[in-house]
């Protein structure tokens, strides 16, 4: 379970997140909604251990994220899919996927893998699961945007994290490819009973692929409810900065 207890974060005296408390159960698929600057990325970075809260605590299965080593300890619990993907363009698909294992390897094994790839069967299986098994030796820069998204997802599979964080995972894709990736992402996390927490800018994707929606505006939680209760009225209120959002009970 992911728990944020009284968590707050500010930058240069400006609140990015006001104190909030959230409990996210194992296997949930949670969509973070809200206008730009609402605190979605800050919330993901807190859960992922990228930044520390100014107050409160973030725990994963009862373990304080701030106490975890950013290598093996954190990698086994949290995997992150950034909008920029963080792939190395000049490296092969295989080497980019193996990067998901670096948190588990010694420095020596990591260096050896550059010339003698490690755990190749695992990499092949990850590519098979994301639907591009023939791209193993392809240079990553030669792939389409959709294929690069799948490589980033395969790297998450290789990492083996129990919680997957995705920051606008389909922002750079056209509608058809966005649907394809969301279908693939949610299928994989569901099959593995992983927890998915993603910031999403397209509300119909939140309704179609997630079980729970959390609305943020100006660093505050405006609603937290099952997606089946996510009405147009609630969404219009969230994105209309001149009016307060309609409230909903979970």
Show which residues each predicted segment covers.
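Helix-to-loop junction immediately C-terminal to a conserved catalytic motif
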Residues: 48
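ABC ATPase NBD coupling module
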Residues: 64-79, 113-116
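Conserved ABC ATPase "signature" region
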Residues: 109-135
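Conserved ABC ATPase signature
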Residues: 139-143, 147
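Catalytic Walker B motif of ABC-type/P-loop ATPase nucleotide-binding domains
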Residues: 164-167
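Helix N-cap at the start of a conserved alpha-helix in ABC-type nucleotide-binding domains
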Residues: 175-177
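H-loop/switch region of ABC-family ATPase nucleotide-binding domains
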Residues: 200-201
């Amino acid at each position: 379970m992911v728990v944020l207890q009284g968590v707050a974060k500010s930058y240069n005296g400006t609140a990015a997140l006001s104190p909030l408390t959230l409990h996210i159960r194992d296997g949930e698929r949670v969509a973070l909604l809200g206008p730009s600057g609402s605190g979605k990325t800050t919330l993901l970075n807190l859960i992922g251990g990228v930044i520390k809260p100014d107050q409160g605590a973030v725990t994963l299965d009862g373990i304080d994220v701030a106490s975890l080593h950013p290598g093996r300890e954190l990698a086994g619990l949290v995997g992150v899919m950034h909008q920029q993907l963080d792939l190395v363009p000049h490296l092969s698909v295989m080497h980019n996927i193996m990067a998901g294992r670096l948190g588990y390897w010694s420095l020596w094994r990591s260096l050896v893998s550059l010339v003698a790839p490690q755990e190749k069967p695992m990499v092949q299986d990850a590519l098979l699961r994301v639907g591009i098994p023939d791209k193993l030796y392809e240079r990553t820069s030669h792939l389409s945007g959709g294929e690069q998204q799948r490589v980033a997802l395969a790297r998450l599979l290789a990492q083996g994290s129990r919680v997957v964080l995705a920051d606008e995972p389909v922002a750079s894709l056209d509608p058809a490819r966005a649907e394809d990736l969301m279908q693939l992402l949610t299928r994989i996390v569901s099959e593995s009973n992983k927890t998915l927490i993603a910031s999403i800018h397209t509300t119909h994707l939140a309704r179609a692929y997630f079980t729970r929606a959390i609305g943020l505006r100006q660093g505050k939680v405006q609603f937290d409810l099952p997606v089946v209760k996510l009405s147009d009225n609630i969404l219009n209120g969230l994105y209309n900065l001149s009016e307060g959002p309609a409230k909903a009970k979970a």
